[in-house]
Amino acid sequence: MDVFGRGRAATADDYRRFLERNSRAAAKLAAATTPTHTASSRQQPEVSARPRHRSLSSRRNSVPHYDPHAGAGGDGQLALSERPSGTLGALAMAAQRRKSIGRPDTPVNAAMGSALRSSQRPRGDVRNPRGEGQTQRGGSRGEANHAQRRQSVTQSTAARQTQPHQGRPRPRRNTLRHM
């Protein structure tokens, strides 16, 4: 069935018209769209304000910002953190402090991770052939045991279910512990 007619794919406008016919759907659409509009209008001033701050800070710290070797050493960053003043400066300093605190930890963690991985690999290589050997040797026996176990488990549960529950079912272990 061709809902929108004209034998073509429905555009957004067609869909909007279709929804407007159905008042309930239109109301839902309105309810769904209004919060997003308000959120976008709220976000816009913040977004427009942020680049201004960036441009000011870039003008203020123009020399160290564009110096390609400033990031390599700690001196350039210290010079940067001393210059800006006010709330922006405080924020920038806090961000730099966080970065400087985080820096020494990360390489150590990365190195430790690689060492742990390398130590785990040979162990895994040693384990795997043993496991494969076991499955090849006694795989059939193991499977038979598992099948028997499964059957017994299913039988016991079925037998339990056939008995009619008298009154309330027995509370679980956790509740008994509290009682």
From Swiss-Prot:
Biased composition (Polar residues): 150-165
UniProt feature, compositional bias: Low complexity: 26-39
Location of the region described as Disordered in the Swiss-Prot/TrEMBL record: 26-179
Pfam hit, one: DUF5434
Composition bias, Basic residues: 167-179
Highest taxon of the lineage: Viruses
InterPro entries attached to this UniProt entry: DUF5434 (IPR035264)
Protein's name in the database: Uncharacterized gene 59 protein
Organism per entry: Equine herpesvirus 1 (strain Ab4p)
Taxon lineage: Viruses, Duplodnaviria, Heunggongvirae, Peploviricota, Herviviricetes
